[in-house]
Amino acid sequence: MGDYFKGFAVKVLADVDVNKLSSNQHEFNGSRAFRELLGTPHGKKYLPTRMAYLDDDLEELPELFETFLTWYDARESNAARGPEFRLLYRAEADHIINRAAAGDTLFLAEEENGNLILVIAKKGSTILRQLQWVFDVQHTDDVLFVATDMGMQAPREEIASEELLALLGIDVDLTDDGLLDSILRRFGEKLWPSTPEFSAYARSVVKHADPVRDPDGTLMQWVGMEHRMFRTLEKYRISESIADGFLDAEGVVDVEGFLKLSLSVHNRRKARAGLSLEEHISTILKTNDISFVKKTKTEGKKEPDFLFPSKAAYGDLGFPSQFLTMLGSKTSLKDRWRQVLNEANRIPQKHLLTLQPAISEDQTAEMQAENLRLVIPRALHGAGFTPAQQGWLLGLDDFILEVRAREIAGTHLEQAVLA
């Protein structure tokens, strides 16, 4: 976080902050404490600010609203009285502030250039838990928390924090020019290598991974390496397209061509992220001698990502369902976790692996009520989850042990029947 911000403040909003009937007009209360972040103003300081309100209904990256905050001492000209610092927002930002309610949380971050980012996250939401995770703030009961020593912030997994920083308008550069030559040598003139071959190459680059002793750490290493390698190749390929320009034969700007390129980048990223995660999970399962089948149909068009131990066992109604397992995989969830609930009717408890680093208690309670169990790499089990949630989560190592035990029990049953 220190690469992007000089400091930040986190404030749980009170009624006086958001209720026009009881608030100081367009002012965030508790402004004295903001001085630790913003410094002592001399005269009025007009701070360029990008703002947004975030909740779990968000489907795409929000368009941050550009405005100004005013930071000043209302008593600067009155030396006989103590300072009265005020942080004001303009009426043009009312459409954002009016969505907020008491109990929501405000995040105010100062970029290296002195500009501010202000986002408000809905109380009890998953996006709030994710922002608390990425800022390393678990002081959820504090009215106001300020951090200016960014060197003290705990490091975060790059691939997990990238999407969250994008919500704040921060472009995280995960490219590595040192990898480009080896990628181009390996794939030659192939524009976009297939996901299976690119994933396999990424795994070959990672040294000291142990998918048997440390499947959780190995998955994070492989996914992280492929993500970095793909972004490096993507930057190279897109730079080529941009260098060619977006002018048609008559020299007119080809807007449609530009939009087509932008959309293709967006779609390719989404598609490859999910497919590459499946590739790495498959390799870990195979290395651990776990029997499974990928993307096989169960009922009708239902097609779980992973089915254990086999399609034949699933289709054999004499094979006990307690020895069957299914696993879905999604890099992030939102409400898409519900999609796996209707897959594989014979299996009452569903499993879903995700790389999402934080989830609200309300959402995990819904998952438990629907008999869904999350599998999350252990590196992500920490600050984004409460102790109660952590006790419920499975690591990938836990999941492998569970599936292996069911496979052994099912094999013993089949042998007993044959005997």
Q: Which residues fall in each region the model found?
A:
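Accessory beta->alpha helical hairpin/"wing" motif in late/C-terminal subdomains of nucleic-acid enzymes
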Residues: N113-Q130, T232-S241, G245-F246
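Interdomain/boundary linker segments immediately adjacent to catalytic/signaling cores
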Residues: S182-L275, H280
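Short, charged/polar micro-motifs that form catalytic or ligand-binding hotspots
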Residues: A93, N267-L275, M326-K330
